[in-house]
Amino acid sequence: NPGNILDLGSGTGASYSDLKNFDVTALDPDEQMLSLNNFEKKIIGKGEELPFNENSFDNVLCCVVWRNVDDTEKALSEVNRVLKPGGKFILLDMTRPKNTFYKLSHKIGTYILLHFVGLITLNLKEYRFLYKSLDFYPQPEVHLTKNNYTNLVIERIGLFDFVYLGVFTK
């Protein structure tokens, strides 16, 4: 039993089908996105100022939104505050590969693909942001080790290792 879960940056609730049978609180700063979310408990808020008491959640989940957090250091501190002792923070996101060849290939490939998709969907601004965010977000192995968690595990997965999964235990 994973206990109660905070879905940080829940947006439209993409994780709903996997988590619908659990006690989940969806948090997102965008009220319009939350209105499309199927979770019962929905709260408007940001990761940097979590509106919960200390030790409120057994687990915190954050999927493909960490690069959109304005102050990740503050958000890490807030997640640590609301997690119960022994609780886990599970973070899934994207970054550039570490290998120089893969990094260059990934940069060229994502530039072409994301700009193409942006043009087709008439959302070029959003896809440009996604492309740029892969460069200005520091490598997770450097950034995520600056916290109060123990048993930190960061695993790169997928083609070119540009997707990573971070699991932290409080």
Question: Model-derived features: where do they sit?
Answer:
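Conserved alpha-helix/loop element of class I SAM-dependent methyltransferases that forms part
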Residues: 1-3
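Class I SAM-dependent methyltransferase SAM/SAH-binding core
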Residues: 6-49
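C-terminal alpha-helical "lid/dimerization" subdomain adjacent to the S-adenosyl-L-methionine
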Residues: 15, 27, 95-145
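A short acidic, Gly/Pro-enriched loop at the edge of an enzyme's catalytic core
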Residues: 48-60
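A short SAM/SAH-binding and catalytic strip from SAM-dependent methyltransferases
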Residues: 59-72
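A short glycine-rich, Lys/Arg-flanked "PGG" loop and its adjoining helix->strand segment in the class I
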Residues: 73-85
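Conserved beta-strand signature within the Rossmann-like core of class I S-adenosyl-L-methionine
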Residues: 87-94
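Core SAM-dependent methyltransferase catalytic element
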Residues: 148-150, 155-170
